């Protein structure tokens, strides 16, 4: 007998297939995933790739350009005009879509906090009074800090990139385990895929990512805004 379970999260999907016996004609359900096709333009792209050994360390951010077949690094165009976090229509129309916005995720965090305050026993870590969600975002004056839980994934399984104005986070992990007897085996498959719309007032080529103990931390610095002070004469 084979079973398939599908659970969704802000990082889309976590699919596992296991407990398959050879008595069932060796039929195994293939892993499934939920996704929405995205439109990609061949423009400037920033890629954060995991490098080094298997230890969880910081992820180096590499800057490359895909225009005209030129692989030389180019400056990222910054137009600090769109200060608000845009809403992606795909994330609004399809609740299972991997395309999200930071505004949507922050609103979701606020709703979870309100629900927990209304029902004190809900969504709290055992033994503590703190709320623990699979992701967290803090937006302040200088930077945007993000946290995503990716249990079971190493930095070799995770890829963070910036495509145009989208922050793309992908993770994939496949593992096969032997069963307790010779007639059964299991397969675990974890997949994460989300896209967040970035505002214009961030420094895209200075985004940093770090993976520690299955938790991904992303730091997005903001551009410095000159404050112009005008004295008003009092008559």
UniProtKB/Swiss-Prot annotation:
Tissues expressing this chain: In fruits, flowers, leaves, and stems.
Keyword Electron transport: no
Stated induction or repression of this protein's expression: By high temperature but not by drought or anaerobic conditions.
The keyword Transcription regulation is annotated on this UniProt entry: no
Name of this protein: Small heat shock protein, chloroplastic
Annotated compartments: Plastid, Chloroplast
Similarity remark: Belongs to the small heat shock protein (HSP20) family.
Species in which this protein is naturally found: Solanum lycopersicum (Tomato)
Basic and acidic residues bias (residue ranges): 52-63
Cystine crosslinks: none
Entry's Gene Ontology BP terms: response to heat
Major subcellular site: plastid
Domain sHSP positions: 126-235
Region Disordered: start-end pairs: 1-23, 51-80
UniProt KW keywords: Chloroplast, Plastid, Stress response, Transit peptide
CC terms in the record's Gene Ontology section: chloroplast
InterPro entries documented for this protein: A-crystallin/Hsp20_dom, HSP20-like_chaperone, HSP21-like
Superkingdom of this protein's organism: Eukaryota
Compositional bias ranges of the Polar residues kind: 64-74
